[in-house]
Design a protein with these regions (language model features):
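Histidine/acidic residue-rich metal-binding segments in metalloenzymes
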Residues: 67-86, 92-171
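Short helix-capping segments at alpha-helix termini
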Residues: 46-54, 149-151
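Divalent metal-dependent hydrolysis catalytic cores, especially in the metallo-beta-lactamase
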Residues: 11-37, 52-64, 80-94, 117-127, ...
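Glycine-rich loop at the start of a catalytic domain that most often binds anionic cofactors/ligands
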Residues: 35-45
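Loop/helix-junction capping segments adjacent to catalytic residues or to phosphate/diphosphate-binding pockets
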Residues: 5-6, 31-35, 66, 164
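Di-metal (Zn2+ and/or Mg2+/Mn2+) metal-binding site signature of metallo-dependent hydrolases
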Residues: 1-11
Length: 171
């Protein structure tokens, strides 16, 4: 999470000091939803690298209910976009534009699978009736297992898991 604005110079410097490359999260305000936006953000990151750094940002797109297969094809064709991030709407920082109906994105997942573009998932449900400690497991049961079954060749990264259930599932 490199963020943008006033935070970008310090976050890029910190990451570039420790790593040669990093997957860059697209949950800015507004979110990074297209390849041109990702490339513009990449340019800003590169401008903020410390002198002599060869840090390379690996860009991602933010999936929304408006994402089109053509957006995925463009991302797959870009040498700088490495995946697409799924945020359930309201699940985390700047996720208001996230996905409301995950199953409606199945055509997008199909295109991602065809073009070998990884799906990076912030995996939790946002239903206030579900205990916060059960939200990853419910996401796994309701969404992740069906996605894996429907798209067996789709590369998936289940990011920043926080529960033993999620760790067991990944293992």
């Amino acid at each position: 999470h490199l963020r943008d604005g006033d935070y970008l110079p310090s976050t890029v410097a910190d990451v570039a000091e420790r790593f040669g490359r990093a997957i860059v999260m697209p949950n800015l305000a507004p979110p990074v939803t297209t390849v041109p936006q990702a490339l513009a953000y990449r340019d800003q990151i590169l401008l903020n690298r410390p002198p002599g750094s060869d840090f390379q940002p690996l860009m991602t797109l933010y999936l929304t209910d408006q994402t089109r297969p053509s957006d995925i094809i463009a991302a797959a064709q870009s040498p700088h976009v490495y995946g697409c991030k799924l945020y359930p709407a309201g699940a985390t920082t700047n996720s208001d534009a996230g996905v409301g109906a995950i199953r409606a994105l199945y055509p997008i997942f199909e295109t991602m699978q065809q073009h070998q573009l990884p799906l990076l998932i912030h995996g939790e449900v946002t239903d206030p009736q579900i205990d916060i400690f059960d939200r990853e497991q419910v996401f796994i049961d309701q969404y992740l297992i069906p996605i894996i079954a429907t798209f067996p060749d789709l590369k998936i990264v289940f990011e920043h898991i926080t529960t033993e259930d999620a760790a067991r599932f990944v293992a």
